[in-house]
Amino acid sequence: MALSTATKAATDALAANRAPTSVNAQEVHRWLQSFNWDFKNNRTKYATKYKMANETKEQFKLIAKEYARMEAVKDERQFGSLQDALTRLNAGVRVHPKWNETMKVVSNFLEVGEYNAIAATGMLWDSAQAAEQKNGYLAQVLDEIRHTHQCAYVNYYFAKNGQDPAGHNDARRTRTIGPLWKGMKRVFSDGFISGDAVECSLNLQLVGEACFTNPLIVAVTEWAAANGDEITPTVFLSIETDELRHMANGYQTVVSIANDPASAKYLNTDLNNAFWTQQKYFTPVLGMLFEYGSKFKVEPWVKTWNRWVYEDWGGIWIGRLGKYGVESPRSLKDAKQDAYWAHHDLYLLAYALWPTGFFRLALPDQEEMEWFEANYPGWYDHYGKIYEEWRARGCEDPSSGFIPLMWFIENNHPIYIDRVSQVPFCPSLAKGASTLRVHEYNGQMHTFSDQWGERMWLAEPERYECQNIFEQYEGRELSEVIAELHGLRSDGKTLIAQPHVRGDKLWTLDDIKRLNCVFKNPVKAFN
């Protein structure tokens, strides 16, 4: 039987390039490259407007054996600590209740990002032409599989060994109720796997990992430790050990297209869009989770953001890519303004919509209010007084018949959803830089909170057609939606979400039903 072309090529290459007698990993890596050949045509299923060079190198030069050995050691350390020492020390119940709720969101939402990163890096493997570059992407595919399991394990560990397991144990089902879910899908799903393959690399590797890994995965371990959580640092620092290779993959993606004429034409616009897509969600959500989802504070979110995003990434990291024509995103200045107030604006809305969550929220106490005012002068007059009014009206007590969403309606502060980012905003109450912009397309009204998202939508309106929470549930009563989407604890009547983290005065489905709260689409006022 005649040999296939591929088999013959491999046989001839092996005959010409004998296997190394050494077990040195770098020598083996060099030997493996001799099996490469030039493609007449790139047969990828995933189109890109850029041409990725065929000679691009991989910085870390991993081979499968070395990769497996390295990751096995890390997993032994991680799971050994979790299943032995931390369990014996009853670490799960020593976590502050507010932080326990924060991890319901962080670990579950990050799991979605890691899961989609599997597909994203697999797509890049298929699109790349250089064998070394493919090898780097393939190692990242394996990393992302590992990280998906790790994030899921954090929820599992808290559900089994921690306090208040509701939300940890079924977050994949209950997370879809509230407005934070679709915004998360926009950055962690659509941004990573939809559209041009190189654009996906910019979203995932150059922005998501190189820019936001430090303020997310590294910073979260500091906040976790400060609030009694030893589980999260054990897992997330293990995840972080892989991230440098992922950043290098993003760097090499840019290197591979540097000489392509399309790079000069499209790259900086695509990078700006990727950065704004990621920061529009991460900047307010991470700041909200860290500062409002903790009892013991580390440092103001704005300082963390400035250090890692503005200075380290926007200045140093992007500066290193300057020789390839890469420029800092034009939207970086506006993002810096968002870092100061946007997370405070978002928490007002998150607390107002607390029944739609899969986690418990809590109003800032007096000590926390003083911390906010000291680090964000003017915070109390704008936000603190509102929280005090809500507390005085009994927002934590189900017998009060009051949820803060009613306050927004009473005071004519409509809540909108940004069509591109899917992040809620209230322009009449925002202290950050949110301005209401409205467009009509195909008979549907679309709202936007900033010029950058508006520009992306105007360029590709068909790309942003996802229904928001008010469109999806318009005309439906709130308790009906909560029950349908499994927002109840195991007793079948008590809500998973609560407006406090205590064990008493828990809201039930009947309490919500008595409010007769019906979803309305605020854009109907423009018709």
UniProtKB/Swiss-Prot annotation:
Xref: InterPro entries: Ferritin-like_SF (IPR009078), Phenol_Hydrox (IPR003430), RNR-like (IPR012348)
Binding site for Fe cation 1: 114, 144, 147
Molecular function per GO: metal ion binding; methane monooxygenase [NAD(P)H] activity
Co-factor remark: Binds 2 iron ions.
Residue numbers annotated as active site: 151
Biological process per Gene Ontology, one example term: one-carbon metabolic process
Binding site for Fe cation 2: 209, 243, 246
Leader peptide range in chain numbering: none
Enzyme Commission no: 1.14.13.25
Keywords recorded for this protein, A-Z: Iron, Metal-binding, Monooxygenase, NADP, One-carbon metabolism, Oxidoreductase
Catalytic activity from the UniProt record: methane + NADH + O2 + H(+) = methanol + NAD(+) + H2O; methane + NADPH + O2 + H(+) = methanol + NADP(+) + H2O
Required co-factors: Fe cation
Described purpose of this protein according to its UniProt entry: Responsible for the initial oxygenation of methane to methanol in methanotrophs. It also catalyzes the monohydroxylation of a variety of unactivated alkenes, alicyclic, aromatic and heterocyclic compounds.
Subunit details: M.capsulatus has two forms of methane monooxygenase, a soluble and a membrane-bound type. The soluble type consists of four components (A to D): protein A, comprising three chains, in an alpha-2, beta-2, gamma-2 configuration, is a nonheme iron protein containing an unusual mu-hydroxo bridge structure at its active site and interacts with both oxygen and methane.
Family, per entry: Belongs to the TmoA/XamoA family.
Name by which UniProt lists this protein: Methane monooxygenase component A alpha chain
Organism encoding this protein: Methylococcus capsulatus (strain ATCC 33009 / NCIMB 11132 / Bath)
Gene name of the encoded protein: mmoX
